[in-house]
Amino acid sequence: MNKLFLIFLLFPFFLNAGNDNLPVGGRASGMGNTGLCIADVWAIRFNQAALADLRSVSFGVSYESRFLLRSLGVQSLAVAIPTKRGTFGLNYTGTGDQLYLDSKIGLGYGMKLSEKINLGIRLNYHSLRLGNNYGRTQNITAELSLLAKPTDKIQIGFHLFNPTQTKLNDYQNEEIPAIMNLGVSYKFSEKVRGNVEIEKDIELPFSVKMGVEYFPVDNLYIRAGISTNPSIPSIGFGLVKGEFNLDFSSAFHPALGLTPSLGLRYSL
């Protein structure tokens, strides 16, 4: 009951900021939502520049149960298709139900500028629909991203979401946040990597995100992380079977509780 009351109080916030970059995939979610330097199919969401490092066609599907409430569940689908000149990606993300449906579909592209620098872009179509004949509003946003690899152990990622500060509806001031992420990933060994990122929404304080991924034995990954403002710890694991990757994570909000995530990746 207390959680539902808090959700009710915070619902205007979700309505206003629902079209930002929601966490997807299950892998990054287990590492404090640090995904800037991860080259898998979900790079279409976190850093399109990392798509350029993919070598095969990849698919992804995920579901996140935000605060264990079905009405706030996040569904996402993704595909990445490498070509000789770069990698194209397509992603759909939706959250809500019949009364409130917030969705985003985006087309992205990542290319190599050199052996050490990748560039990425993405265009999104946003749609917010309110039930009971309250109508629908929509708009288009852009994303820009970079990935630098100064050494074999260090990667530096940058991602800018909605740099033009586009709104869903100027009349009702329905905003789509403008968000910047900057991060570093360090490969301690073949079994351990660590990520540190800083996120800044122009309307909110800085958030620091940290995560680690450990590969103790074949076919198993263990993950943990934390993000600030508010402080949200997370844990997760990944299982590998052939070309399939199953990722599970769970994050804990101090007031609203658990948010489990499940993702499946497949590469041809």
Question: What is the role of each PLM region?
Answer:
Residues G18-L268:
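Subset of outer-membrane beta-barrel
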Residues L4-F14:
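Sec-dependent N-terminal signal peptides
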